[in-house]
């Protein structure tokens, strides 16, 4: 559904991870497509529409017009829209969140974080690779078993191995102790021209080392600099603890993120879409 040239175009201009076709295919199980300046994924009657334009400035009215075009083309039973904003009433709406971004051209590591990195570095070493094995899966399973996690998030975590095996630009950063035990790992994607993407972070609950996540993120940032990226998309805030970690590194919220689940086969939904498209 998407040509090699379109896939390269999308990845080159990606500033949210869903813009990366390899990432989107791996975690949605769908086929990527482009409509205008927007990327989407289609799987078994479900359309996932990434409402962030690849090149243009976001315009909700234009986004809704292209969403309507995609719905006419594919006739989905369900639509999951992610966008900076969506003013139409109706649909099942998830909590509003924000993407955080670190500007590598101006960022400096705060002294408190340097201390944590130094502390963790006395016990751990960081290795980068594309390997994902039972040790990594065990940390994911431990995380899922230790707290309540939405089913969608659980499914995504279980697809990380498939994602890594299918996307050459994806990389794993491991933190290991002197005995070779895995204390934590990060997963990142470097497929965009300007952005690196900090996607997943897991730590060992069995032998936690203070500063593990800071040590790993430092290594990821250094790799992004080595690859001449301008930014690291640190991902969504998710909760206050996660958002605090990103802010302490200098991450700034730069994009609002909403998820709206829609039922396009309902006449009332289609009427509202078309009214919004042609209103002043």
Residue ranges and their predicted role:
Residues 1-19, 260-280:
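Membrane-proximal basic amphipathic "stem/tether" segments
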Residues 72-84, 225-235:
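Conserved GNAT acetyl-CoA-binding A-motif
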Residues 2-44, 84-209, 218:
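A conserved beta-strand-loop-helix scaffold within acyl/acetyltransferase catalytic domains
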Residues 23-82:
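N-terminal accessory interaction module
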Residues 82, 129-131, 235, 256:
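Conserved beta-strand termini and adjacent loop/short-helix elements that scaffold enzyme active sites
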Residues 70-71, 120, 224, 246:
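Generic structural signal for hydrophobic
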Residues 69-70, 163, 219-223:
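A generic secondary-structure signal
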Residues 169-270:
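Aromatic (often tryptophan-rich) hydrophobic motifs at membrane interfaces
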């Amino acid at each position: 559904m998407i040509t090699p040239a379109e896939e390269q175009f999308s990845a080159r201009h990606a500033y949210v991870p869903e813009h990366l076709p390899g990432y989107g295919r791996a975690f949605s199980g769908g086929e990527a497509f482009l409509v205008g300046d927007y990327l989407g994924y289609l799987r078994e009657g479900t359309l996932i529409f990434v409402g962030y334009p690849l090149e243009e400035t976001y315009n909700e009215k234009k986004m809704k017009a292209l969403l309507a075009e995609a719905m006419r083309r594919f006739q989905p039973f369900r639509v999951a829209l992610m966008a900076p904003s969506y003013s139409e009433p109706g649909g099942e709406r998830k909590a509003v969140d924000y993407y955080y971004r670190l500007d590598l051209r101006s960022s400096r590591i705060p002294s408190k974080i340097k201390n944590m990195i130094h502390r963790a570095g006395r016990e751990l070493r960081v290795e980068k690779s594309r390997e994902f094995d039972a040790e990594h899966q065990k940390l994911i399973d431990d995380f899922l078993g230790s707290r309540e996690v939405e089913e969608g998030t659980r499914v995504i975590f279980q697809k990380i191995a498939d994602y890594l095996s299918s996307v050459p630009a994806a990389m794993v950063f491991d933190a290991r102790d002197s005995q070779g035990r895995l204390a934590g790992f990060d997963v990142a994607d470097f497929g965009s021209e300007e952005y690196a993407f900090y996607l997943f972070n897991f730590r060992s609950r069995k032998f936690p080392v203070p500063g593990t996540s800071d040590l790993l993120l430092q290594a990821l940032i250094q790799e992004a600099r080595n690859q001449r990226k301008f930014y690291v998309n640190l991902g969504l805030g998710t909760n206050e603890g996660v958002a605090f970690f990103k802010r302490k590194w200098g991450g700034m919220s730069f994009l609002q993120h909403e998820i709206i689940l829609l039922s396009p086969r309902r006449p009332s939904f289609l009427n509202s879409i078309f009214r919004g498209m042609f209103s002043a």
